[in-house]
């Protein structure tokens, strides 16, 4: 997410890379009277089932859920006036360099996919050429994830400052987006469909999350089309790679009803597109650390003055039903690329993990039962980013248990789950 990015270290992953498909060649001349060896035919490998063949939303959920984000790492931004950077800035927001241990730990904890947010602009020159060292570093991190058996989603993340969805900025933004995705896609063109690309992140007009105009919708959908066209043009496995395109501001309310039925871009291959939404509702409970009065949620609430009158279980069902109706029921898988709710640091609700974990489990369950892949936004609070040691077993349990178990009590307190 782009809201202040850290929020006391808790900002608001991904699905995996791949088998390199590198072919080894050997040769050698004969001589000295030795007979020429008969070449041994190379057997055709049996394709690994991937999203190239598993296309229904329910199959995608089985393959990829639950997911997690490697947040505040490759997306981290240092001072803007020193760009382009000549070395990695992935540690400037407090996390260690990404390593194999953390991805092994994600897999061991029960996560099946990881979203790897990456900011590219800060490593690109005036011709939009991304520094080779940065492409190599991102590739190394993607390989860590694949080595752990995870699906990976790789995106263009904190680049929204130049991806402005209006006609005044459209041409320049499209040109840069095309250049970036051409370079990224070429770097990974031999990776199989365990690696997914996601074109943009939370595109909206600067400093506003209000309802978009038709101009905003049209330009933002144009960014999706530019992304798809750029990736497909690179060929290789990118010709059929699964690609993730976003709703305006990643808000399910800004789907077909707001921005029109042509939400999905055209594509040269069928059934290889997913839609991405994000979910942090209700804001004052989930991520607004400045609000200390709203610290309970849903049917577990014991103090109705500490819970929002909206945004509880009923609202979750209502909004996720929109995603199911607009996309899942039409055969288009949906990625909830970010969602999260974090304990309060101060006030009467300090340490309110009972409620935040309940939110995590309920929203996971509500998502997967509607064909939506939930991916938790994590910035290092769940697992130790150096060693992979578990830091928050309660949250991990909530996210993994939510895959199959609805935590909602039979009876609710007040009207908390009837909104």
PLM region spans:
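Bacterial N-terminal signal peptides that target proteins for export
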Residues: 1-13
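Active-site region of glycoside hydrolase catalytic domains
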Residues: 175-312, 321-341, 369-372
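Aromatic-rich peripheral "rim/lid" segments of glycoside hydrolase catalytic domains that contact
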Residues: 346-419
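N-terminal carbohydrate-binding accessory modules
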Residues: 36-113, 326
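An active-site-proximal structural segment forming one wall of the substrate-binding cleft
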Residues: 93-113, 124, 128-158, 162-199, ...
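Bacterial lipoprotein signal-peptidase II cleavage site
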Residues: 25-35
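Acidic/histidine-rich helix-loop elements
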Residues: 71-98, 126-130, 168-169, 284-315
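C-terminal motif of bacterial Sec signal peptides marking the signal peptidase cleavage site
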Residues: 20-23
């Amino acid at each position: 997410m782009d809201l202040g990015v850290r929020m006391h270290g808790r900002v608001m992953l991904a699905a995996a890379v791949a088998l390199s498909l590198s072919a080894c060649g050997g040769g050698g001349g004969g001589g000295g009277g030795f007979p020429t060896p008969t070449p041994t035919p190379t057997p055709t490998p049996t394709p690994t089932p991937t999203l190239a063949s598993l296309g229904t939303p329910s199959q995608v959920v089985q393959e990829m859920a639950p997911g997690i984000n490697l947040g505040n790492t490759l997306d981290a931004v240092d001072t803007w006036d020193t760009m382009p950077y000549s070395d990695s800035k992935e540690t400037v927001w407090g996390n260690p360099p990404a390593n194999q241990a953390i991805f092994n730990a994600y897999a061991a904890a029960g996560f099946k996919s990881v979203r790897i947010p990456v900011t590219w602009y800060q490593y690109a020159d005036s011709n939009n050429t991304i520094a080779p060292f940065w492409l190599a570093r991102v590739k190394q991190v993607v390989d860590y994830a694949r080595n752990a058996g995870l699906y990976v989603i790789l995106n263009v993340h904190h680049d929204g400052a130049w991806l402005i969805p209006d006609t005044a900025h459209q041409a320049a933004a499209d040109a840069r987006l095309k250049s970036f995705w051409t370079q990224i896609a070429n770097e990974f063109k031999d990776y199989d469909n365990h690696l997914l690309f996601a074109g943009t992140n939370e595109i909206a007009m600067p400093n506003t999350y209000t309802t978009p105009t038709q101009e905003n919708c049209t330009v933002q959908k144009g960014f999706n089309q530019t992304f798809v066209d750029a990736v497909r043009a690179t060929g290789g496995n990118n010709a059929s790679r699964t690609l993730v395109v976003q709703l305006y501001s990643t808000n399910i309310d800004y789907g077909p009803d707001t921005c029109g039925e042509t939400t999905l871009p055209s594509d040269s291959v069928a059934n290889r597109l997913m839609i991405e939404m994000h979910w942090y509702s209700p804001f004052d409970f989930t991520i607004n650390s400045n609000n200390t009065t709203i610290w309970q949620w849903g049917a577990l609430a014991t103090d109705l003055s500490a819970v929002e009158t909206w945004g509880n279980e009923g609202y979750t069902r209502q909004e996720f039903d929109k995603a199911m109706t607009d996309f899942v029921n039409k055969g288009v898988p949906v990625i909830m690329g970010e969602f999260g709710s974090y304990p309060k640091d101060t006030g009467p609700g300090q340490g309110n993990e009972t409620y935040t974990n309940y939110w995590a489990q309920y929203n996971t369950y509500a998502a997967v039962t509607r064909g939506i892949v939930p991916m938790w936004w994590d910035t290092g609070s769940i697992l130790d980013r150096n060693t992979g040691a578990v830091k928050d077993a309660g949250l991990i349990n909530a996210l993994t248990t939510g895959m199959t178990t609805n935590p909602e009590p039979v009876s609710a307190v007040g009207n908390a789950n009837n909104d």
